[in-house]
Regions:
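Post-DEXD/H (motif II) to motif III coupling segment of the RecA-like Helicase ATP-binding lobe
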Residues: 186, 194-255, 417
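Conserved helix/coil segment N-terminal to the catalytic DExD/H
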Residues: 154-187, 198-203
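A conserved SF2-helicase RecA2
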Residues: 228-253, 258-268, 377, 385-444
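Conserved pre-motif I regulatory segment
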Residues: 36-39, 62-102
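Conserved helicase ATPase core of P-loop NTP-dependent helicases/translocases
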Residues: 135, 148-161, 177, 307, ...
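Walker A/P-loop
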Residues: 96-120, 125
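Conserved interdomain hinge at the start of the Helicase C-terminal
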Residues: 116-117, 268-311, 317-321
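Conserved RecA-like P-loop NTPase helicase motor core
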Residues: 219, 328, 332-420
Length: 444
């Protein structure tokens, strides 16, 4: 039976509960695994499971007791682009009715999603996990769906009686709402949907079971093995495009060496590698920061707009102080007006967490990866958006350090560059400017 909460299974066999009890997989070298958690809820006579887990495991439900959702009459005022597969994505979404849409950054997931919502014609809830993403969605709704009413579900706000309802994932997960609060919602769109695989956030989708549900993510596959949770709630991926044959993107690997790398990286008292301590140590290395400042000066002599990404807020703030007039910060907790002002600067210092999901500055064309990272697909996608007046091809400056764990991360990044068809110039001994050639050994 299908209800407003999900797929009801009466008297479930033990193997179902066992399969729906999951644990994130982590690298044992970096720490201990988290405790398992349940992706189901108890009911009077059984359990409530994610809808598409139920249909794939037990078949279509015999009954559908969900309330009838509210219809809206909102038109989409925009043009979808074939070059980024937007029309094909729309057609696939309407045909599937649910599932995961995977498009690279800059391919217009937001635009396509609004076209889908208008085509289906139901009150639509958009679930986001960051305040600035909620603001971006509101701007896009006003742009592509003029006249549509917009509400918020956030903390004590519960403005459901609107065409579009933008809901914060944290509020949906942690706050108790009245029975039937979201019965009128017919379409749910989850932005950066891979977040709902986490223990707390997965509870948000037990508070509704809409007619249509779509998950948006450029990188739906999680490294912790919990991708299956996404598909239990959303269904399979119905449309996916990968960025490839991007020969106009140029990568400049820059190797940094210092005597500290001759010693082992920092470890915890349990003998495990302390990744966080290692990152902090790198961001506080004076010679390394001097190299970064010199590199930023070289890159910004011309017309490029540069994004500098680091894992540490303090690192971003320290580097930004070296360029007070031409740079700005783009980090969580900043006011919308300050983020907008920073987006106009020639140099933007941002945390990976902020840039990884939702940073939307189409004029960016260059990025420096200032701290080691394995998963960079979303981050480098921020400089690949097509926009009018963009003159420079995308450039990626990849800083890699000489600890073995940093080499392992770098090799993962190399696979991303190779898969995308990016251009990686080789060092020539006669080339006077090592930075211009891309591969250089820096000894400061």
């Amino acid at each position: 039976m299908l209800t407003r909460s999900g797929y009801i299974v009466n008297n479930p066999p033990p193997e179902i509960k066992k399969e729906l009890t999951v644990r994130a997989v982590v690298n044992d070298d970096f720490g201990f695994p988290p405790p398992p958690f349940k992706v189901f809820r108890p009911t009077k006579n059984g359990i409530c499971v994610p809808r598409y887990y139920g249909t794939s495991k037990l078949g279509e439900p015999a009954e559908d007791k969900r309330p009838v959702p509210t219809r809206i009459n909102t038109r989409f005022h925009g043009t979808l682009r074939d070059a980024t597969h937007q029309n094909a994505a729309l057609a696939a979404a309407i045909d599937a009715g649910h599932g995961v849409l995977s498009l690279p950054c800059g391919f217009g997931k937001t635009t396509v999603s609004l076209a889908i919502a208008c085509k289906l014609g139901y009150r639509t809830m958009i679930i986001v996990h960051k305040e600035f993403l909620a603001n971006q969605w509101e701007e896009r709704i006003k742009q592509f769906c003029p006249g549509a009413t917009i509400g918020r579900v956030q903390q004590n706000k519960k403005e459901v009686d609107n065409d579009f309802v933008i809901a914060m994932l944290q509020s949906l997960s942690l706050k108790e709402y009245s029975f039937g609060d979201f019965d009128s919602v017919g379409t749910v769109i989850v932005d950066e949907a891979h977040h709902i695989c986490a223990k707390v956030f997965s509870q948000s989708l037990f508070k509704m079971c809409p007619k249509h549900i779509f998950g948006l993510s450029a990188t739906p596959n999680r490294k912790d093995g919990l991708t299956k949770v996404l598909h239990w709630f959303m269904g399979p991926t119905f449309f996916a495009v990968e960025r490839e044959n991007q020969q106009d993107v140029e990568v400049f690997p820059i190797e940094f060496e210092c005597p500290r790398f001759r010693d082992p990286p920092p470890c915890t008292r349990f003998g495990k590698l302390s990744l966080s301590t290692m990152i902090t140590e790198l961001t506080e290395n004076r010679d390394r920061n001097k190299m970064l400042v010199d590199l930023i000066k070289r890159i910004t002599r011309g017309t490029r707009q540069l994004l500098v990404l680091s894992d540490r807020r303090q690192h971003c703030m320290m580097l930004q102080q070296c360029f007070p007039k031409t740079s700005g910060l783009y980090m969580g907790g900043m006011k919308e007006a300050d983020l907008t002002e920073s987006s106009k600067k020639k140099i933007i210092f941002a945390t990976f967490s902020q840039a990884h999901e939702g940073l939307d500055i189409p004029t960016l064309d260059t990025v420096i990866l200032a701290t080691p990272k394995s998963d960079i697909v979303q981050s480098i996608g921020r400089i690949m958006r097509e926009t009018k007046g963009k003159k420079n091809n995308p450039n990626i400056y990849d800083i890699f350090d000489q600890w073995s764990v940093c080499h392992a991360m770098y090799n993962k990044r190399l696979r991303v560059y190779k898969h995308g068809g990016f251009k990686m110039p080789k060092m020539k001994e006669e080339e006077p400017d090592d930075f211009a050639r891309g591969q250089c050994l820096i000894k400061l």
